[in-house]
Amino acid sequence: MKYYIIAGEASGDLHGANLIKSIKAKDSKASFRFWGGDLMQQQTQGLVKHYRDLAFMGFIEVLFNLRTIFRNISICKKDITAFQPDVIIFIDYPGFNLRIAKWAKKEGFKTHYYISPQIWAWKEGRIKDIKADVDAMYVILPFEKDFYQDKHNFPVHFVGHPLIDAIDNREQTNKEAFAKLHGLDQRPIIALLPGSRKQEISKMLRIMLSITNNFDSYQFVIAGAPSQDASFYAPFLNKQNIHLLLNKTYDLLSVSHAAIVTSGTATLETALFKVPQVVCYKGNAISVAIARQVVKLKYISLVNLILDKEVVTELIQGDFNTQRLIKELTKILDKDNRVSLLKSYDALEQKLGGIGASDATGQLIVDALK
Protein backbone atom coordinates (compact mmCIF):
# COMPACT_ATOMS: atom_id res chain seq x y z
CA MET A 1 0.00 0.00 0.00
CA LYS A 2 0.99 3.64 -0.49
CA TYR A 3 0.96 5.93 2.55
CA TYR A 4 1.13 9.73 2.51
CA ILE A 5 1.94 11.22 5.93
CA ILE A 6 1.90 14.90 6.90
CA ALA A 7 3.65 16.04 10.10
CA GLY A 8 4.53 19.70 10.48
CA GLU A 9 6.44 19.85 13.77
CA ALA A 10 9.26 18.13 15.67
CA SER A 11 6.87 16.12 17.84
CA GLY A 12 4.99 14.98 14.74
CA ASP A 13 8.28 13.84 13.20
CA LEU A 14 8.94 11.65 16.25
CA HIS A 15 5.48 10.08 16.23
CA GLY A 16 5.48 9.79 12.45
CA ALA A 17 8.77 7.89 12.55
CA ASN A 18 7.40 5.37 15.04
CA LEU A 19 4.21 5.02 13.02
CA ILE A 20 6.17 4.36 9.81
CA LYS A 21 8.18 1.72 11.66
CA SER A 22 4.96 0.06 12.78
CA ILE A 23 3.37 0.14 9.32
CA LYS A 24 6.50 -1.30 7.67
CA ALA A 25 6.39 -4.25 10.08
CA LYS A 26 2.79 -4.99 9.06
CA ASP A 27 2.89 -4.15 5.35
CA SER A 28 6.01 -5.44 3.60
CA LYS A 29 5.07 -3.61 0.39
CA ALA A 30 4.49 -0.24 2.05
CA SER A 31 5.80 2.85 0.28
CA PHE A 32 5.74 6.38 1.65
CA ARG A 33 5.73 10.06 0.79
CA PHE A 34 5.80 12.40 3.75
CA TRP A 35 6.18 15.86 5.20
CA GLY A 36 8.23 15.55 8.37
CA GLY A 37 11.81 15.54 9.53
CA ASP A 38 15.03 13.66 10.15
CA LEU A 39 13.49 10.88 12.25
CA MET A 40 10.92 9.97 9.61
CA GLN A 41 13.66 10.15 6.99
CA GLN A 42 15.66 7.60 8.98
CA GLN A 43 12.74 5.18 8.61
CA THR A 44 12.04 5.55 4.90
CA GLN A 45 12.64 7.49 1.70
CA GLY A 46 10.12 10.00 0.40
CA LEU A 47 10.60 13.32 2.22
CA VAL A 48 8.74 16.11 0.42
CA LYS A 49 9.24 19.02 2.85
CA HIS A 50 11.05 19.31 6.18
CA TYR A 51 9.05 20.65 9.11
CA ARG A 52 11.65 23.37 9.72
CA ASP A 53 10.22 25.05 6.60
CA LEU A 54 6.65 24.76 7.85
CA ALA A 55 6.57 25.78 11.50
CA PHE A 56 4.94 29.14 12.13
CA MET A 57 3.35 29.81 15.50
CA GLY A 58 1.03 32.52 16.76
CA PHE A 59 -1.60 34.53 14.91
CA ILE A 60 0.76 37.34 13.86
CA GLU A 61 3.52 35.00 12.65
CA VAL A 62 1.02 33.07 10.53
CA LEU A 63 -0.25 36.28 8.94
CA PHE A 64 3.27 37.30 7.93
CA ASN A 65 3.85 33.91 6.30
CA LEU A 66 0.51 33.35 4.54
CA ARG A 67 2.08 33.31 1.07
CA THR A 68 4.49 30.54 2.09
CA ILE A 69 1.71 28.57 3.77
CA PHE A 70 -0.57 28.70 0.72
CA ARG A 71 2.32 27.78 -1.57
CA ASN A 72 3.01 24.73 0.61
CA ILE A 73 -0.65 23.71 0.46
CA SER A 74 -0.50 23.86 -3.34
CA ILE A 75 2.71 21.80 -3.42
CA CYS A 76 1.15 19.22 -1.11
CA LYS A 77 -1.99 18.79 -3.22
CA LYS A 78 0.04 18.34 -6.40
CA ASP A 79 2.35 15.82 -4.73
CA ILE A 80 -0.55 13.78 -3.36
CA THR A 81 -2.20 13.74 -6.78
CA ALA A 82 1.02 12.50 -8.39
CA PHE A 83 1.61 9.82 -5.72
CA GLN A 84 -2.01 8.56 -5.54
CA PRO A 85 -1.76 7.12 -2.01
CA ASP A 86 -4.12 4.49 -0.61
CA VAL A 87 -4.43 6.60 2.54
CA ILE A 88 -3.37 10.03 3.78
CA ILE A 89 -2.35 10.14 7.45
CA PHE A 90 -2.43 13.52 9.15
CA ILE A 91 -0.43 14.04 12.35
CA ASP A 92 -1.70 17.00 14.42
CA TYR A 93 -0.73 20.31 12.65
CA PRO A 94 -4.40 21.23 12.11
CA GLY A 95 -4.20 24.58 10.32
CA PHE A 96 -2.50 22.89 7.39
CA ASN A 97 -3.81 19.35 7.67
CA LEU A 98 -7.52 20.13 7.90
CA ARG A 99 -7.27 22.16 4.68
CA ILE A 100 -5.65 19.22 2.94
CA ALA A 101 -8.17 16.79 4.45
CA LYS A 102 -11.13 18.74 3.04
CA TRP A 103 -9.58 18.72 -0.43
CA ALA A 104 -8.46 15.08 -0.16
CA LYS A 105 -11.91 13.84 0.85
CA LYS A 106 -13.47 15.53 -2.18
CA GLU A 107 -10.80 13.92 -4.37
CA GLY A 108 -11.73 10.48 -3.04
CA PHE A 109 -8.67 9.74 -0.87
CA LYS A 110 -8.97 7.90 2.44
CA THR A 111 -8.19 10.27 5.31
CA HIS A 112 -6.90 9.12 8.70
CA TYR A 113 -5.90 11.48 11.53
CA TYR A 114 -3.33 10.48 14.16
CA ILE A 115 -3.10 12.84 17.16
CA SER A 116 -6.21 14.98 17.18
CA PRO A 117 -6.19 18.73 16.74
CA GLN A 118 -6.81 20.24 20.18
CA ILE A 119 -10.33 21.37 19.34
CA TRP A 120 -11.30 20.74 22.96
CA ALA A 121 -9.16 23.81 23.72
CA TRP A 122 -10.22 26.14 20.94
CA LYS A 123 -11.93 26.17 17.55
CA GLU A 124 -14.39 23.48 18.66
CA GLY A 125 -16.37 24.35 15.54
CA ARG A 126 -13.75 22.39 13.58
CA ILE A 127 -15.61 19.25 14.67
CA LYS A 128 -17.91 19.76 11.66
CA ASP A 129 -14.96 19.61 9.28
CA ILE A 130 -13.46 16.63 11.07
CA LYS A 131 -16.72 14.67 10.92
CA ALA A 132 -17.08 15.51 7.24
CA ASP A 133 -13.49 15.07 6.08
CA VAL A 134 -11.80 12.48 8.35
CA ASP A 135 -12.52 8.77 7.93
CA ALA A 136 -10.74 7.63 11.10
CA MET A 137 -9.37 9.47 14.14
CA TYR A 138 -6.76 8.08 16.55
CA VAL A 139 -6.61 10.05 19.82
CA ILE A 140 -3.81 9.95 22.39
CA LEU A 141 -5.23 11.74 25.43
CA PRO A 142 -7.72 9.94 27.70
CA PHE A 143 -10.31 12.73 27.80
CA GLU A 144 -10.36 13.09 24.00
CA LYS A 145 -12.37 9.90 23.49
CA ASP A 146 -15.19 11.20 25.70
CA PHE A 147 -15.01 14.59 24.00
CA TYR A 148 -15.49 13.14 20.54
CA GLN A 149 -17.84 10.24 21.24
CA ASP A 150 -20.02 11.54 24.08
CA LYS A 151 -20.16 15.23 23.21
CA HIS A 152 -20.00 15.08 19.41
CA ASN A 153 -21.14 11.55 18.51
CA PHE A 154 -18.00 10.88 16.47
CA PRO A 155 -16.39 7.45 17.07
CA VAL A 156 -12.62 7.54 17.60
CA HIS A 157 -9.87 5.14 18.65
CA PHE A 158 -8.00 5.85 21.90
CA VAL A 159 -4.58 4.31 21.26
CA GLY A 160 -2.58 5.61 24.24
CA HIS A 161 0.20 8.17 24.10
CA PRO A 162 3.08 7.56 21.66
CA LEU A 163 5.56 9.38 23.91
CA ILE A 164 5.49 6.37 26.21
CA ASP A 165 6.64 4.24 23.26
CA ALA A 166 9.33 6.72 22.27
CA ILE A 167 10.75 6.82 25.79
CA ASP A 168 10.45 3.08 26.31
CA ASN A 169 12.25 2.31 23.02
CA ARG A 170 15.25 4.54 23.63
CA GLU A 171 18.67 3.27 24.68
CA GLN A 172 19.38 3.93 28.35
CA THR A 173 21.87 6.69 29.18
CA ASN A 174 24.77 6.20 31.59
CA LYS A 175 25.01 9.38 33.65
CA GLU A 176 28.79 9.35 34.17
CA ALA A 177 29.55 8.48 30.56
CA PHE A 178 27.11 11.15 29.38
CA ALA A 179 28.78 13.83 31.52
CA LYS A 180 32.25 12.85 30.32
CA LEU A 181 31.22 12.75 26.66
CA HIS A 182 29.72 16.24 26.75
CA GLY A 183 32.22 17.97 29.01
CA LEU A 184 29.92 18.24 32.03
CA ASP A 185 30.98 18.04 35.67
CA GLN A 186 29.35 16.18 38.55
CA ARG A 187 26.96 18.92 39.64
CA PRO A 188 23.22 18.21 39.19
CA ILE A 189 21.88 19.26 35.80
CA ILE A 190 19.09 21.74 35.22
CA ALA A 191 17.81 21.25 31.67
CA LEU A 192 16.57 24.23 29.67
CA LEU A 193 14.02 23.39 26.98
CA PRO A 194 13.29 26.66 25.14
CA GLY A 195 11.27 25.19 22.27
CA SER A 196 12.00 24.36 18.65
CA ARG A 197 11.22 27.52 16.66
CA LYS A 198 13.68 30.40 16.41
CA GLN A 199 11.22 33.04 17.50
CA GLU A 200 10.23 31.24 20.70
CA ILE A 201 13.76 30.04 21.52
CA SER A 202 15.11 33.59 21.49
CA LYS A 203 12.36 34.89 23.79
CA MET A 204 12.50 31.97 26.20
CA LEU A 205 16.28 31.61 26.54
CA ARG A 206 16.83 35.26 27.36
CA ILE A 207 14.85 34.85 30.59
CA MET A 208 15.85 31.25 31.32
CA LEU A 209 19.53 32.20 31.26
CA SER A 210 19.02 35.25 33.48
CA ILE A 211 18.87 33.04 36.59
CA THR A 212 21.98 30.91 36.20
CA ASN A 213 24.18 32.98 38.52
CA ASN A 214 21.73 32.26 41.35
CA PHE A 215 22.31 28.50 41.16
CA ASP A 216 26.08 27.97 41.21
CA SER A 217 25.77 24.47 42.65
CA TYR A 218 24.00 23.32 39.47
CA GLN A 219 24.98 23.26 35.79
CA PHE A 220 22.60 24.41 33.07
CA VAL A 221 22.28 22.57 29.77
CA ILE A 222 20.24 23.85 26.82
CA ALA A 223 18.35 21.20 24.85
CA GLY A 224 19.08 22.29 21.28
CA ALA A 225 16.25 21.60 18.85
CA PRO A 226 16.99 19.26 15.92
CA SER A 227 15.62 21.94 13.58
CA GLN A 228 18.30 24.49 14.58
CA ASP A 229 22.06 24.64 14.03
CA ALA A 230 24.63 25.21 16.78
CA SER A 231 25.41 28.62 15.27
CA PHE A 232 21.92 29.83 16.16
CA TYR A 233 22.57 29.16 19.86
CA ALA A 234 26.07 30.68 19.89
CA PRO A 235 24.99 34.15 21.13
CA PHE A 236 23.36 32.53 24.18
CA LEU A 237 26.51 30.69 25.27
CA ASN A 238 28.59 33.67 26.40
CA LYS A 239 28.11 32.96 30.12
CA GLN A 240 29.88 30.43 32.31
CA ASN A 241 28.02 27.34 33.43
CA ILE A 242 25.95 27.13 30.21
CA HIS A 243 26.20 24.12 27.91
CA LEU A 244 24.43 23.20 24.67
CA LEU A 245 23.43 19.73 23.49
CA LEU A 246 21.91 19.45 20.03
CA ASN A 247 19.25 16.84 19.36
CA LYS A 248 19.89 15.02 22.66
CA THR A 249 16.78 16.04 24.61
CA TYR A 250 15.82 12.56 25.82
CA ASP A 251 19.37 11.75 26.90
CA LEU A 252 19.52 15.09 28.69
CA LEU A 253 16.20 14.63 30.49
CA SER A 254 17.17 11.14 31.60
CA VAL A 255 20.08 12.56 33.63
CA SER A 256 18.56 15.90 34.71
CA HIS A 257 17.65 16.93 38.26
CA ALA A 258 15.14 19.62 37.21
CA ALA A 259 14.01 21.44 34.08
CA ILE A 260 12.64 24.74 32.84
CA VAL A 261 10.37 23.92 29.93
CA THR A 262 8.55 25.87 27.24
CA SER A 263 4.90 24.89 27.09
CA GLY A 264 4.18 22.16 24.56
CA THR A 265 4.82 18.45 24.12
CA ALA A 266 8.09 18.84 26.04
CA THR A 267 6.19 19.34 29.30
CA LEU A 268 4.75 15.84 28.99
CA GLU A 269 8.10 14.37 27.94
CA THR A 270 9.76 15.93 30.98
CA ALA A 271 7.08 14.49 33.27
CA LEU A 272 7.44 11.00 31.78
CA PHE A 273 11.17 11.17 32.50
CA LYS A 274 10.17 12.03 36.10
CA VAL A 275 11.99 15.37 36.08
CA PRO A 276 10.48 18.18 38.23
CA GLN A 277 9.80 21.20 36.03
CA VAL A 278 8.66 24.79 35.78
CA VAL A 279 6.56 25.41 32.67
CA CYS A 280 6.99 28.76 30.90
CA TYR A 281 5.67 30.64 27.92
CA LYS A 282 6.16 34.10 26.46
CA GLY A 283 4.79 34.80 23.00
CA ASN A 284 3.96 37.71 20.77
CA ALA A 285 1.80 40.01 22.93
CA ILE A 286 -0.94 40.39 20.31
CA SER A 287 -1.03 36.66 19.55
CA VAL A 288 -1.30 35.81 23.24
CA ALA A 289 -4.03 38.41 23.80
CA ILE A 290 -6.05 36.88 20.96
CA ALA A 291 -5.42 33.36 22.24
CA ARG A 292 -6.66 34.25 25.72
CA GLN A 293 -9.95 35.34 24.17
CA VAL A 294 -10.52 32.12 22.25
CA VAL A 295 -8.77 29.36 24.21
CA LYS A 296 -10.98 27.93 26.94
CA LEU A 297 -8.50 26.11 29.15
CA LYS A 298 -7.48 26.46 32.78
CA TYR A 299 -3.90 25.37 32.02
CA ILE A 300 -1.40 25.45 29.17
CA SER A 301 0.70 22.39 30.07
CA LEU A 302 -0.41 18.89 29.13
CA VAL A 303 0.60 17.66 32.58
CA ASN A 304 -1.95 19.89 34.31
CA LEU A 305 -4.59 19.41 31.61
CA ILE A 306 -4.51 15.62 31.82
CA LEU A 307 -4.55 15.55 35.63
CA ASP A 308 -7.04 18.45 35.72
CA LYS A 309 -5.17 20.24 38.48
CA GLU A 310 -2.07 22.41 38.87
CA VAL A 311 0.76 19.95 39.38
CA VAL A 312 3.49 21.98 37.68
CA THR A 313 3.77 25.76 37.96
CA GLU A 314 2.99 27.70 34.78
CA LEU A 315 4.67 31.06 34.23
CA ILE A 316 2.97 32.84 31.32
CA GLN A 317 3.82 36.18 29.71
CA GLY A 318 4.49 38.75 32.48
CA ASP A 319 4.73 36.05 35.14
CA PHE A 320 7.67 34.57 33.25
CA ASN A 321 10.38 36.81 34.67
CA THR A 322 13.68 36.38 36.47
CA GLN A 323 12.33 36.78 40.01
CA ARG A 324 9.42 34.35 39.61
CA LEU A 325 11.59 31.82 37.83
CA ILE A 326 14.16 31.86 40.64
CA LYS A 327 11.37 31.38 43.18
CA GLU A 328 9.67 28.49 41.36
CA LEU A 329 12.90 26.69 40.47
CA THR A 330 13.97 26.88 44.12
CA LYS A 331 10.67 25.22 45.07
CA ILE A 332 11.12 22.20 42.83
CA LEU A 333 14.70 21.73 44.03
CA ASP A 334 13.31 21.24 47.56
CA LYS A 335 13.21 17.55 48.52
CA ASP A 336 9.67 17.49 49.95
CA ASN A 337 8.19 19.31 46.97
CA ARG A 338 9.94 16.91 44.61
CA VAL A 339 8.43 13.85 46.30
CA SER A 340 4.91 15.22 45.91
CA LEU A 341 5.50 16.17 42.28
CA LEU A 342 6.90 12.76 41.37
CA LYS A 343 3.83 11.04 42.86
CA SER A 344 1.67 13.15 40.55
CA TYR A 345 3.84 12.12 37.61
CA ASP A 346 3.15 8.46 38.43
CA ALA A 347 -0.60 9.17 38.35
CA LEU A 348 -0.16 10.92 35.02
CA GLU A 349 1.57 7.95 33.45
CA GLN A 350 -1.19 5.60 34.60
CA LYS A 351 -3.82 7.82 32.97
CA LEU A 352 -2.00 7.76 29.65
CA GLY A 353 -2.04 3.97 29.40
CA GLY A 354 0.85 1.66 28.63
CA ILE A 355 3.15 1.18 25.68
CA GLY A 356 1.90 0.35 22.20
CA ALA A 357 0.27 3.52 20.78
CA SER A 358 2.30 3.53 17.57
CA ASP A 359 1.83 -0.19 17.05
CA ALA A 360 -1.91 -0.04 17.70
CA THR A 361 -2.36 2.86 15.31
CA GLY A 362 -0.31 1.20 12.59
CA GLN A 363 -2.37 -1.98 12.90
CA LEU A 364 -5.68 -0.10 12.73
CA ILE A 365 -4.57 1.79 9.62
CA VAL A 366 -3.28 -1.30 7.81
CA ASP A 367 -6.43 -3.27 8.71
CA ALA A 368 -8.65 -0.45 7.43
CA LEU A 369 -7.03 -0.72 4.00
CA LYS A 370 -7.63 -4.45 3.58
Predicted regions and their residues:
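Nucleotide-activated sugar donor-binding and catalytic core shared by glycosyltransferases
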Residues: 1-370
